[in-house]
Amino acid sequence: MAVRGEAAQDWAKPGLRGPSPAPVARGDHRCRGGSPSSPRGSGCCWRALALQPLRRSPQLSSALCAGSLSVLLALLVRLVGGEVGGELESSQEAAAEEEEEEGARGGVFPGPRGGAPGGGAQLSPWLQPAALLFSLLCAFFWMGLCLLRAGVRLPLAVALLAACCAGEALVQLSLGVGDGRLLSLPAAGVLLSCLGGATWLVLRLRLGVLMVALTSALRTVALVSLERFKVAWRPYLAYLAAVLGLLLARYAEQLLPQCSGPAPPRERFGSQSSARTKEEIPGWKRRRRSSSVVAGEMSGCGGKSHRRTSLPCIPREQLMGHSEWDHKRGSRGSQSGTSVTVDIAVMGEAHGLITDLLADPSLPPNVCTSLRAVSNLLSTQLTFQAIHKPRVNPTVTFSENYTCSDSEEGLEKDKLAIPKRLRRSLPPGLLRRVSSTWTTTTSATGLPTLEPAPVRRDRSASIKPHEAPSPSAVNPDSWNAPVLMTLTKSRSFTSSYAVSAANHVKAKKQNRPGGLDKISPVPSPSSSPPQGSPTSSPVSGIASVQFPESPEVTTKRGPGSHRALTYTQSAPDLSPQIPPSPVICSSCGRPYSQGNPADGPSERSGPAMQKPNRTDDTSQVTSDYETNNNSDSSDILQNDEEAECQREPLRKASACGTYTPQTMIFLDKPILAPEPLVMDNLDSIMDQLNTWNFPIFDLVENIGRKCGRILSQVSYRLFEDMGLFEAFKIPVREFMNYFHALEIGYRDIPYHNRIHATDVLHAVWYLTTQPIPGLPSVIGDHGSASDSDSDSGFTHGHMGYVFSKAYHVPDDKYGCLSGNIPALELMALYVAAAMHDYDHPGRTNAFLVATSAPQAVLYNDRSVLENHHAAAAWNLFMSRPEYNFLVNLDHVEFKHFRFLVIEAILATDLKKHFDFVAKFNAKVNDDVGIDWTNENDRLLVCQMCIKLADINGPAKCKDLHLRWTEGIASEFYEQGDEEASLGLPISPFMDRSAPQLANLQESFISHIVGPLCHSYDSAGLMPGKWVDDSDDSGDTDDPEEEEEEAETPHEEETCENSEAPRKKSFKRRRIYCQITQHLLQNHMMWKKVIEEEQCLSGTENQAPDQAPLQHSSEQIQAIKEEEEEKGKPRAEETLAPQPDL
């Protein structure tokens, strides 16, 4: 029947009528051409119209089949009943007696009332219950088929029947309902309650009603009709038939083809089997990058697309030059006839997994050696595959301007797509990344948490200064043009500045004051709260009692001072003689002029820009700040071109949309440093700068109400001590102007204020200038260095090494970081420390994201504060010519300097803390270790240095540590109060009514500061001093704190000739480190406070949530040097806690 119906259905379709058209034509002629009175023609048409809905609707056809089968079964039951009723009357009494006897014992009756005698009637007693059970099976078959096609899985349907069996057992056993009362209302109510509750959990309303109604009806039929069985058995037989029917439905659903009609709501995307497969098998999808530029290039290739379907459409020509690719195909692919394609992303993931395994200290040495060898092989392949980009022509100078096109930004980003994916996958987290979660930490508590991994691609931040045409065609005032900030349609946030030809290199001071044009789409941290922020938000300004402002500073700030997120250059006036604001390309985000096409190129042919680019650079930083949100700068690519502005502005004007500034803010005058520039009454305290526990709060008290100048004064002393003013020809007045404006931009909040910025600046200066035991130096003496840096390509005429005037090398067994880090990178680290918390609102990143602050929206909830600090500080620097203290840096050096500063600021995001620590540990534990000639390694060291300086409070002496702890606690409590006022859940450790200061500090030291100090100290970068055995005789009994020193080429005990005998083979050398000593002492102090609080509260057992803290506490006490492998330049150990020296 089904085959015939399907054939009829196919025959009814227009396109499936078969090859013989003659019969069809005759049929059509009869239906159309027949007379209306012809009964044969009219009957044919009416039959076709009546069967057409049945053919097209699977529901109607299924209902018709179920109905016909039910009618047949009913007729069969009727025939069985008639046969039984026509039996001989003589056997009724015997059958009745036998029925009563069997009914009393329980079991199957041998025959019905009036059973027929003889052998011919022996099958009739079994025919009626078999027919009834078959009917129940068929009914559940159709119901199961309906449920399966609706998306219900077979185990769920069987579970519903199990719920029915449980209800029956509850009715019969627990409630004690007799056989005669199974159809009573209480029994039916209990059973329907069980079934309905189970159905409500797994089925939708329509399917649930169908299931309950049909099951209850069939149970009633079974209780009434199955007279051959005991009453208590009848429901279970019905459920058994139901299970068989569901199994048959599952089997039939797999065999029968799916209907071509519209599928149910859960099946409209495919067949039932495919849907169940998708539900049972989780789908792991790779994040893909779509680009209109890449799509356009791929569409224009015209050849076969050699790529995996799960990877982005990036042609090989983007990964390496055309000539290199043709050469590789000629040398390799021509030999075998096929080209070997390597999946770079998979190799990157494998390299990351191996690096993660290497971080495990419990691995055997042979396993570590094998894994390290595989990691080196993968690193070579990754470098070979991913960083094949055309080199810059050494004869091309950076003074040339390139054409600004629509696709320039997209091409540059697509070329960096693969390395960005590698940078995102290579650094493993300190805690293993499992499934779709990653480890992170909140900046508030320092406790590690788990967050869902982001599903969006990381956005890059690119801020690009731009040179306008020459002064011969434009206004010669290089700082008159306004700063324009816009959001481009590319994947990065571009802040384009319209600056004239001699931007920061030949900046001139303006001659007359005037209005200041400005567009500021970002809220200002001035006295008025920004849009979208509550009135009580710290963005509206928090007056601090501890650090009052002087009237002089308050007067200079004014009601509309430049404490905004974006700053602009002042213009003399708004007269018509001034050229109009440059137009910004809406495609690439770069400004271009609409002036005369005959305007000459910008004047960039000075001596500073004449030197050619090095051709032997292995790794050169990108010309712009182009990095992912992970702030992982290990894979800095060689820059293939300087993306300058267009040389002919009007040639591409028709192809670029325009963006016109909408908002203008007028500022009167910049904030300048007051006289005298250098305060002369601070020498007594400034002489203590070379101590780790610098009395910074005493300095605040000495400055008094002028404490707003603390950052500029300390910055001047440190720069002057390092000789940076002479090395880079920094003008003192511009330097003091900018740093004074920078310190004014810090808000008066308890912790993240200008005093904290000064403390971090002093900490990075101390860590980079103090003697470090056993640290090898790149240069032999002060000032002697090679002609050029092997990695960056900068000559040491401007990139030499500087040392502190207070640095005195005791002997050749000490070194310092300033002897291994070039001066430009060192100055970038100091400037980043001063900028790193500029305009901090006193709230955490999590709070800004939770309240949908404008900064969180602007930076896509990623490193919100860190991006804001860097952008606002650089915007301040570029806003006025009076702030340009880098006037003598050439264009390449300035871009490199800016890149380093931004990377260092973004590294202070504690959410990426574990990634940095794990990456640094992997670098230190590598065979090569830290390569001081590699710019990437030096940048990683600088990032770790500023991270340690940013959280150095627990590593200070007790008095300073308690002062900083009081400040951070006050700031946390203010955020907790605001969260409570906004109806938000109060963050951990921020509830003023339930202070947990000791737990906060103990956990912060255990999870954040301790591992960071341990990693930094294990790399041999922590300042300290050698201690002889005679100086620590009381502490040498502990064997765990003693290690034998390995052979190093710089030790006195090792002879120059490796074959010559040495005076001493081993000598136990120990190091005293004041920083780690303070850290251990403060950690023990907070542990004792926690124990005392627990004793006072009557808690003898430690809380469950502090068990991991205790484990970390024990680990943090072991901050000592590991035994170095052969060939390492340092092998020592750290002293146990001792009294201060």
Curated annotation (Swiss-Prot):
Residues 522-532 have a biased composition (Pro residues). SUPFAM superfamilies: HD-domain/PDEase-like (SSF109604). It catalyses: a nucleoside 3',5'-cyclic phosphate + H2O = a nucleoside 5'-phosphate + H(+); 3',5'-cyclic AMP + H2O = AMP + H(+); 3',5'-cyclic GMP + H2O = GMP + H(+); 3',5'-cyclic UMP + H2O = UMP + H(+). Its cofactor is Mn(2+); Mg(2+). Residues 618-637, 1098-1113 have a biased composition (Polar residues). InterPro entries: HD/PDEase_dom, PDEase_catalytic_dom, PDEase_catalytic_dom_sf, PDEase_CS. PANTHER family: CYCLIC NUCLEOTIDE PHOSPHODIESTERASE. Residues 1029-1046 have a biased composition (Acidic residues). This is cGMP-inhibited 3',5'-cyclic phosphodiesterase 3A. The chain crosses the membrane at residues 62-82, 127-147, 157-177, 182-202, 207-227, 229-249. It comes from Rattus norvegicus. Coiled coil: none annotated. The gene is Pde3a. Its main location: membrane. Mg(2+) binds at residue 837.
